[in-house]
């Protein structure tokens, strides 16, 4: 019993430390990061994600910086009834490129790697339905991801203990594709 308690305490002490070791994009620039992104791939240990990952499609993020140093993010997700939309405020936490999103249960969001013009890798530590989980998302400025972007993503997510079977490359969808919509 004592060894179980010791193991549980060590696990609790270790988890926040391991989570906090995820580095940020050096000299993150919110202005350069703003604009349209496609979510082209994800990896996660979230049980809800794992149950739905084979039925997901690419979604979009339209991002703009806020005066407070955060990000306003407009998300569009393909659904059975068309394109679902959600707006969220990414609140700055300490360093540039580090956020939390209380409305979505995102306790920790970090821009890990980006070249601003073609890709970004995001780390998300979240709570969903009472369970904590880790997610990594690969953003691309186009629906066709570059080899450099894919390599950065594939090199990063396993360092968090996420195996390949927890990753999905998302198929393209016209439901939320701004390029397929007619101009107003």
From Swiss-Prot:
Keywords: Disulfide bond, Secreted, Signal. It is found in: Secreted. Disulfide bonds join 83-176. Coiled coil: none annotated. Gene3D superfamilies: 2.40.128.20. Its main location: secreted. InterPro entries: Calycin, Lipocalin, Lipocalin_CS, Lipocln_cytosolic_FA-bd_dom. GO terms for molecular function: small molecule binding. GO terms for cellular component: extracellular region. Residues 1-20 form the signal peptide. Pfam families: Lipocalin. Belongs to the calycin superfamily. Lipocalin family. This is Lipocalin-15. It comes from Homo sapiens. The gene is LCN15.
